Amino acid sequence: MEFTPPLQQGILLRRYKRFLADVQLSDGSEITLHCPNTGSMRNCLYPGETVWFSTSDNPKRKYAHTWELMTTPNAGLIGIHSGQANTLAEEAINKGIITELTGYDSLSREVKYGDENSRIDILLQGAQKPACYIEVKSCTLLEDGQGYFPDAVSLRGQKHLRELMHMVSQGHRAVLLFVVQHSEIFSVAPAAHIDPEYAKLLKIAVLAGVEVLAYRCEMSPTEIHLAQACDVRV
């Protein structure tokens, strides 16, 4: 996915009220960005480091600028826009990058499914193949060299694991796909120290037949895309 028009840069001052961040531009002026990330962004906030943001020409938007990337103290990059994970996953599936998810005829998004009033992120279907239900999660939490999900207690994430297990019990294929939007993460594990129930459910889900995949993003101020698989430690 290319950033069009090109991203602009500034220096992070603060994130507040969950969805807002103040940034200083090169001329010394300050602007407020929309922060498209509902998580805690634990270990992703580095005041004084460079951020990259997009600008919308929609006059109805209260905040025209959206925070897209964050530079780390180690000169790495973090994808802040968690909502882009589904688009990145769809793009990678269509290009055959995620080899485990090739060979299907159609791809649909946000399809109702399950017993708990859910919508699946991606549904793959093909002739003479079980339907494949894919739940996509953005992973950005890095601690002591290990990537973790979630970065806060996630009742929604727990629900999705139950739904995926239900799909397997119905004879379908179910996949949990971690989109790793942190250039310094090379393996993903459940964050049992943050959400022990999620970690427990993930182990149960794997035993029930839910597949878990993780793919790292290649990121720059001009584009972002899924590039290669990485290790998952359940």
UniProtKB/Swiss-Prot annotation:
UniProt-recorded Gene Ontology molecular function terms: DNA binding
CDD domains assigned to the protein according to its UniProt record, in alphabetical order: SfsA-like_bacterial (cd22359)
Stated family: Belongs to the SfsA family.
This protein's name: Sugar fermentation stimulation protein homolog
Lineage: Bacteria, Pseudomonadati, Pseudomonadota, Gammaproteobacteria, Alteromonadales
Gene that specifies this protein: sfsA
